Amino acid sequence: MRTNMNTRINGTNVILVPYQEKHVTKYHEWMKNPTLQYLTGSEPLTLEQEFEMQKRWLEDKDKCTFIILDKHIFVSTESEVDAMIGDTNLFLNEPQESCIAEVEIMIADEASRGKKRGWESVILMMCYGIEMLNINKLRAKIKTDNAISIKIFEKLGFQEVGKSEVFQEVTLEKEVSSDWMNWLHSKLQSITSDSN
């Protein structure tokens, strides 16, 4: 999405940067992992296909993607590629419902899991979508056996609205309100820096 192509979102322990060509090779390595393919509902791509997808996503008006960097690694290495730990996306995939977005989060780097990097990243992404893209309802589709991700979204106030046995996924939604936005901002302010 061109809207976020020059946007950098600084959090306490993460930085969100637009998905660029320099990130593709490492992203492609992550996506060779069968578990990540399953959890994200992704098909394996060749490196060439991954580069083509990155270019398409940059042009698509309905996809907003950020690569998640570990802020502490980035500060010490000054390398976005070395600091990459995952990605977060907003898909505005229903034109008749232009103010609804599907939100996704993936922490691909196993060493970065369990450190609340996903929590901080998804809150930053949702705030961006609400404030910059005028999103007023968020939706998450999660594999039914991905208990950690389901728990994160429930903790964020999302409620289950559907379940698909065929796709083995649960759909959760959250209506945006000013009270909830204030709550999200308070959660961001309560995140403490850790350099681990």
Give short role names for the model-derived ranges.
Residues Q20, E29, E43-L47:
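Generic structural signal for well-ordered secondary structure
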Residues E29, Y38, E52-R56, N182, ...:
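Charged/polar, solvent-exposed surface patches and flexible loops
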Residues E43-E78:
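Active-site rim helix/loop that mediates acceptor-substrate recognition in acyltransferases
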Residues L36-P44:
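A short gly/proline-enriched turn/hairpin at secondary-structure junctions
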